[in-house]
Design a protein with these regions (language model features):
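Short Fe-S-cluster ligation motifs
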Residues: 4-18, 29, 43, 47, ...
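Beta1-alpha1 glycine-rich phosphate/pyrophosphate-binding loop at the start
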Residues: 5-32, 61-73, 78-87, 109, ...
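C-terminal catalytic lobe of FAD-dependent flavoproteins
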Residues: 23-37, 42-45, 350, 358, ...
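Feature captures the FAD/FMN-dependent oxidoreductase FAD-binding
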Residues: 78, 140-141, 145-149, 197-246, ...
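Glycine-rich dinucleotide-binding loop and its adjacent helix/turn
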Residues: 123-140, 198-218, 241-305, 421-436
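FAD-site-proximal beta/loop scaffold in flavoenzymes
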Residues: 250-283, 376-450
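A conserved FAD-binding loop/helix module that cradles the flavin
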Residues: 295-300, 305, 446-477
Length: 482
């Protein structure tokens, strides 16, 4: 390592952001770039561990100590080579990943972890700015064809790996643009879509073909694709949202998070979305049910739309400020965090469960009846019991359901192919990422269930190796996951 005492000399710096009063008036990226000298010092805090546990936290197996040291030594072009060796899309993970690698950082045992995520993002941004990112087309073609169904991070990772291996790859996306949740689920202020588009341009130059408006299993029979292509990779994600079937669910003003986020993202893309198709929070009291990342995306969006007030509800208790005794390193630290959206305002309410939606005489939601709850163990299972005499009412005109996703959509594609599902309703696969149907593979949330973007990319890369092996009898493609 270039600076073995860096972790002693320099403390962890915080991610810089645009001022709240400025950023909530537009939809541009909220994060600011780090000064180069600051990044070099942050990279120097990587402490030359005998066993770098950051690898344990990263599903991709990123060579984190290598590129931290290269940044410290101002060798940025070498750094992007090390970074791309394990990660197709560091601009996505460097922006959107919660950084489980930092949760496993050895320095985090008794100090603040290394700013791995910030250094990663700086490397890839510098590489694009310098023109170091160029298409990497294959030396020759194999004559084999692969259809990737779904264009989220898992599908894109699989497609790029397979195209570079010489296969002719076509990505099918049911929406009108490529990107999946990266396109229409992630708000513009969190990741500007130009970041996605520049990577897609590289993939097209490498030979990947994109087909949009193609809902395989609905307007394109799955069997037709099986006849046309030598292999299929199912990367359709876990798109079925978790509902809240309580009294009043049918009221106007109660929406799934994705039904709220998608039209606004379309407007940010420049689409003409009619006012009646846009779910707007302007001038309304808003309640977001769900305390995860999707809830935070909704929170930042309602701020920019001009909500009157916002409450975000979470059924779990408020996390502690530091690790609990039963949450030791190198586990992911379950601690209280403040995202950029939370820093912009709104009230977070913990240990509550919604009892019913209350409507007015016109059939519109006007309030929520909510109860305090406490977690208890029953037969080894965590359940939430209502605290007696704890109910209260939250007035609102808009409710957003952001409680996650329960799995892939079964009608259409999965039913037509006849793939086997797990007990949790996800697509089942073998050790080579193939389903029970020969030549049909799967990766990402469709087989794992809802998860992190870093897992999706890792699974896409791993499935690509399985496909390559199936088509060619062997494969030299790397696979970070078994």
């Amino acid at each position: 390592m270039g600076k073995v005492t860096g972790f002693i000399e320099w403390k962890r710096d915080k991610q810089p952001y645009r001022p709240v009063e400025e950023r909530t008036r537009d939809w541009r990226q909220v994060m600011l770039p780090w000064p180069v000298d600051t990044l070099r010092k942050q990279g120097a805090r990587c402490m030359d561990c005998g066993i770098p546990f950051c690898h344990q936290g990263c599903p991709l197996g990123n060579l984190i100590p290598d590129w931290n040291d290269l940044v410290y030594r101002d060798k940025w072009r070498e750094a992007i080579g090390r970074l791309h060796a394990t990660n197709n899309f560091p601009e996505f993970t460097g922006t959107l990943c919660p950084a489980p690698c930092e949760g496993s950082c050895v320095l985090g045992i008794n100090d603040d972890a290394v700013t791995i995520k910030a250094v990663e993002l700086a490397i890839i941004d510098r590489a694009f700015e310098e023109g170091w990112i160029a298409p990497e087309p294959p030396v020759g073609l194999t004559g084999k064809t692969v259809a990737v169904i779904g264009s989220g991070p898992a599908g894109l990772a699989a497609a790029q790996q397979l195209a570079r291996a010489g296969h002719q790859v076509t990505v099918f996306e049911r929406a009108d643009r490529i990107g999946g949740l990266l396109r229409y689920g992630i708000p513009e202020f969190k990741m500007e879509k130009r970041v996605l588009d520049r990577r897609l341009a590289q993939m097209e130059a490498e030979g990947v073909r994109f087909v949009v408006g193609a809902h395989v299993g609905v307007d394109r029979p799955a069997e037709a694709l099986r006849r046309e292509f030598d292999a299929l990779v199912l990367c359709g994600g876990a798109c079925a949202p978790r509902d809240l079937p309580i009294p009043g669910r049918e009221l106007d003003g109660v929406h799934f998070a994705m039904d709220y986020l998608t039209p606004q993202n379309r407007r940010c893309e420049g689409d003409r979305v009619p006012d009646e198709a846009l779910v707007s929070a302007q001038g309304k009291r808003v309640v977001i049910i769900g305390g995860g990342d999707t809830g935070a995306d909704c929170l930042g969006t309602v701020h920019r739309q001009g909500a009157l007030e916002v409450h975000q509800l979470e059924i779990l208790p408020r996390p502690p400020d530091t690790r609990a005794a039963d949450n030791p390193w190198p586990q992911w630290p379950n601690i209280y965090r403040v995202s950029s959206a939370h820093a912009e305002g709104g009230e977070r309410v913990y240990s509550v469960s919604t009892v019913r939606f209350v409507g007015d005489e016109r059939g519109r939601v006007k309030a929520l009846e909510v109860a305090r709850v406490e977690p208890v163990r029953e037969g080894g299972r965590l359940v939430f019991q209502e605290v007696p005499d704890s109910r209260f009412v939250l007035p609102c005109e808009l409710v957003l359901l952001a409680m996650g996703f329960v799995g892939p959509e079964r009608p259409g594609l999965l039913e037509q192919l006849g793939v086997t599902l797990t007990d949790r309703g996800n697509v089942k696969r073998d050790e080579h990422w193939m389903t029970n149907v020969p030549g049909v593979f799967t990766a990402g949330d469709m087989q794992r269930g809802q998860s992190l973007i870093v897992w999706a990319i890792a699974e896409g890369r791993s499935a690509a190796r399985g496909v390559d092996r199936y088509l060619m009898g062997r494969s030299d493609l790397p696979a970070p996951l078994p």
